[in-house]
Amino acid sequence: MLYVTTRNKSDAHTAHKTLTTDRGPCGGFYAPFQMPSFGKSDIEALKGKNFGQCVADILNIFFNARLDGWDVDFSIGRYPCRIVSMSRKVLVAETWHNPDWDFARMVRNLSGCIRGNDEAGGVPSDWAWMSIRIATLFGLFGELLRLGVADTEQPIDIAVTTGDFSAPMAAWYARKMGLPIGNIVFSCNENCAVWDLFHHGQMRTDMIATTTNTPDCDVAIPAALERLIYAQLGADEVKRYLDACTNGLEYRLDDDKLAQLRKGFFSAVVSQKRMESVIHNVYRTSTYLLDPYSALAYGGLQDYRSGSGEGRNALLITERSPACFAETVAKAMGITVQEMKERTRMN
């Protein structure tokens, strides 16, 4: 597969280049020259494959890696992700079942596997991260199809946190490729410049991030937003966006461009105080223990459903175990860290 960048669609780059550098010579993010597309029969066929094979098939398209399901299983284990029913029509995808309790471990291992390394050394590139997120979604949808909670005729919503916008963007790419994804609900913490853009069509580019207890979301301007602007509005709009960022100006979109940019998305803001309340209330009502980031995502999903009346199935993506945030979760629960760890083991 050949790649272009979000700032230059004239020059082509190899898949190998996307694995060794985060950005092209122009500073833009790598993106496929032509995004692969899957029909309904291809999506239905996911049901007959295990998670590892689903992941391998997608990574082979992006990188010609010649992986099979056994390679993926050997790299990340046979059951690195689990789908849990949390409440009515809300399923949780736990993508962190590994020794580190962190999706990043899975990304490192698979990145090394793609590169042909026996060990997961080195830092995964930006496109490696993105492609593995996409491949993971295909693996998860294979499981959802087997469970009978998703099909090609009934989309399922996705709930994630904003962060650097990689998670919402991966869901967008996966939907573009043919997965039956409905709306992509992404939640910000107090750092909500993207919410301003999606709701008001304007965004300050000179903001300084506010420190919270969800630091991965403490981002003033999410880097991967550039990807969405490129995909939805084109390279010329990326240039206008970058000019605003370079000069610390307000970035504005007219009504038509705004409608195009946010099509299929819902943006929410969930404060630190509310995040803690969500952790406490969800455990009280369903005995499911959320980590701080998945609590942000679930709070946004609640806002989306209450505002739209939408009641179809939703998949909440979690990338780290609550045990990784013992103090924050314990505080939200009103218990000691030791008690929280015991509940984590029980779950």
Where are these regions (language model features)?
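PLP-dependent amino-acid enzyme catalytic core
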Residues: 1-347
